[in-house]
Swiss-Prot record:
Keyword Transferase: no
Coiled-coil intervals, chain numbering: none
Gene Ontology MF annotations: DNA binding
Protein name: Cop-6 protein
Organism encoding this protein: Staphylococcus aureus
Similarity section: Belongs to the transcriptional regulatory CopG/NikR family.
């Protein structure tokens, strides 16, 4: 069985967070056992989908 995966080119992004925003990401990280980077990506995709209809 061959799985065809689409290669995605990723770009590095730097975010400056307030202490409160960082704490929220820490809570998400602990609750769902995912990295802050993954949590941020998920939140960006969720917002884009809600705001623009598709991502």
């Amino acid at each position: 069985m061959v799985v065809d995966r689409k290669e995605e080119k990723k770009v590095a992004v730097t975010l400056r967070l307030t202490t409160e925003e960082n704490e929220i990401l820490n809570r998400i990280k602990e609750k769902y056992n995912i990295s802050k980077s993954d949590a941020t990506g998920i939140l960006i995709k969720k917002y884009a989908k809600e705001e623009y209809g598709a991502f």
